[in-house]
């Protein structure tokens, strides 16, 4: 990249910083380069902060601009940013969905050595709900609490989570992106990644662990919700007390990220939950009911209730010492003999070595139960599953016979020959419904093209206002698009990418979900559809 160190001033205003960053991005740099990844996104984040405080008075904008210039200077000098140990350090990445620079926070042990032969365990902490949270005022842990993880030998990661998202949707993608960044920039042990969180982050811990079995070696939720069917009636007086009284589509949207409905996904996961006995915000019953539901399926979950304690057990350190001290003793087992999984969307399709490839019917729960018996036969039992893939490398299967692997699918005996990569692809039952013939409707529901609408914003998307029609129509479309963009910013802390319909390219259409504003008379993309 043609950015010389002497081209970066000691001081600059917002306009000059924007010009410098624009020049870097215009050169199409290698975004996988660690020097780029540890500096340029951080400079973009500081630019965002400087814009937010510009005009408020004081020196805050100059401080953020100075930090951005320091990051650009390191980039020009080909210097990878190396966080200082024993200090909570802000880093950043560019989000794949809306293209905004987002923060995450890293705390390295005092003994951290990137050249150490043994990789480092990673502790991921999810914060609680705070109405005022922003990139200017993130919810992070104090240094002494960070040191609990560090003194246990862990790198500590605190994702931002896009404000207050329950770590679902865009918040979940932020957590996974932060984990990916840290794994690729630091020597992390993939079999010792631990997840923990408090309050809202406690529920996020349940959700991420249950949606991604096989990712975390242990999960330790603290004072988190587990059943939104019991939670919403406490807040919304018109919410039905009985889940059967919800319209089916609404019930599905509650249950697809409701921990207690995903409890079977806890099988083979190491979980330790803590709660205050007298928690008036999130009753201890939320945790105890989850533990009971797991035990009913033969799934053990460790639990500790603090006698007489309120919701805010995480204002003291014992809950962290309990959770993290226990977690670091756990290692991920990638080859359990019995795997169970429930999902409502193919965005979440994998448990350890078993993957759901297709549903029979969309909009309904799918359940997968895979078990390697003592005689080596693979038993697969399903509900609403059309196709399954088995990764035979981690699966504890014997060597295949001359006719392949012995499998029983919903009680039917089969012999399945592995594919070239060694995996097994098994057709369980055909998908239901009628698919129009010919070219009348080419797209079929598949992973990434199925909904719910939340999934539009989990992947790359563009806001596309129309530019056609009369002046008043154009102004209405523009105003509606800007209103939505501001709503997104208030929710997810970032201004998403915008492309008017007349400038949208075929390549951009292929690479993005489109959020279209206007009708056929004002938006050429809507007209084409």
Where in this protein do the model-derived segments appear?
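Active-site machinery of serine-nucleophile hydrolases
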Residues: 119-185, 462
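Short beta-strand/loop motif that positions the catalytic acidic residue
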Residues: 266, 272-275, 279
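Gly/Ser-rich "nucleophile elbow"/oxyanion-hole loop immediately N-terminal to the catalytic nucleophile
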Residues: 110-118, 166-200, 210-216, 265
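Mobile cap/lid helix-loop segments that gate and shape the active-site cleft of serine hydrolases
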Residues: 132-141, 217-264, 268-269
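Long, folded non-catalytic interaction modules
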Residues: 435-529
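C-terminal catalytic histidine-bearing segment of alpha/beta-hydrolase fold enzymes
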Residues: 278-280, 284-377, 384
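A domain-start/cap signature at the N-terminus of enzymes
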Residues: 3-120, 451
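Short beta-strand immediately N-terminal to the catalytic nucleophile in serine-hydrolase-like folds
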Residues: 195-197, 222, 274
């Amino acid at each position: 990249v043609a950015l010389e160190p002497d081209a970066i001033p000691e001081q600059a205003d917002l306009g000059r910083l924007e010009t410098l960053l624009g020049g870097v991005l215009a050169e199409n740099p290698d975004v996988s380069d660690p020097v780029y990844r540890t500096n340029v996104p951080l400079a973009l984040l500081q630019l965002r902060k400087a814009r937010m405080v510009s005009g408020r008075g004081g020196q805050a904008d100059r401080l953020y601009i100075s930090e951005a210039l320091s990051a650009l200077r390191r980039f020009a000098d080909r210097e990878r940013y190396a966080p200082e140990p024993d200090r909570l350090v802000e880093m950043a990445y560019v989000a794949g969905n809306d293209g905004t620079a987002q923060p995450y926070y890293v705390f390295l042990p005092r003994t951290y050595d990137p050249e150490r032969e043994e990789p480092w365990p990673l502790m991921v902490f999810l914060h609680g709900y705070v109405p005022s949270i922003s990139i200017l005022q993130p919810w992070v842990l104090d240094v002494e609490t960070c040191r609990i993880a560090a003194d246990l030998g862990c790198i500590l990661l605190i994702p931002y989570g896009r404000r207050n998202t329950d770590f679902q949707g865009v918040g979940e993608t932020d957590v996974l992106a932060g984990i990916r960044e840290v794994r690729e920039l630091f020597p992390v042990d993939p079999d010792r990644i631990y997840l923990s969180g408090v309050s809202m982050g406690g529920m996020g811990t349940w959700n991420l662990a249950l949606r991604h079995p096989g990712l975390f070696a242990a999960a330790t939720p603290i004072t988190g919700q587990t059943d939104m069917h019991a939670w919403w009636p406490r807040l919304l007086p018109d919410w039905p007390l009985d889940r059967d009284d919800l319209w089916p589509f609404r019930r599905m949207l509650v249950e697809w990220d409701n921990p207690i409905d995903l409890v079977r996904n806890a099988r083979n996961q190491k979980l330790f939950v803590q709660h205050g006995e007298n928690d008036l915000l999130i009753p201890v019953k939320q945790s105890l009911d989850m533990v009971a539901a797991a035990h009913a399926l033969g799934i053990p979950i460790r639990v500790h209730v603090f006698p007489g304690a309120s919701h805010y057990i995480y204002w003291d350190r014992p809950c962290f010492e309990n959770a993290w001290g226990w977690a670091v003793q756990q290692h991920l087992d990638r080859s359990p003999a019995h795997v169970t999984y429930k999902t409502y969307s193919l965005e979440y399709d994998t448990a350890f070595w078993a993957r759901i490839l297709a549903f029979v019917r969309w909009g309904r729960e799918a359940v997968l139960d895979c078990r390697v018996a003592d005689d080596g036969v693979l038993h697969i039992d399903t509900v609403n599953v059309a196709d399954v893939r088995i990764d035979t490398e981690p699966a504890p299967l014997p060597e295949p016979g001359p006719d392949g692997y012995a499998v029983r699918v919903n009680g039917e005996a089969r012999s399945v020959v592995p594919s070239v990569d060694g995996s097994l692809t098994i057709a369980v039952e055909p998908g239901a419904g009628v698919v129009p013939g010919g070219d009348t409707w080419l797209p079929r529901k598949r992973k990434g093209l199925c909904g719910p609408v939340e999934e539009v914003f989990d992947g790359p998307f563009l806001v596309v206002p129309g530019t056609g029609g009369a002046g008043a129509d154009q102004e209405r479309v523009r105003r509606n698009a800007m209103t939505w963009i501001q709503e997104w910013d208030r929710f997810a802390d970032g201004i998403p990418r915008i492309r008017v319909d007349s400038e949208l390219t075929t390549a951009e259409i292929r690479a993005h979900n489109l959020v279209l504003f206007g009708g056929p008379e004002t938006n050429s993309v809507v007209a084409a559809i």
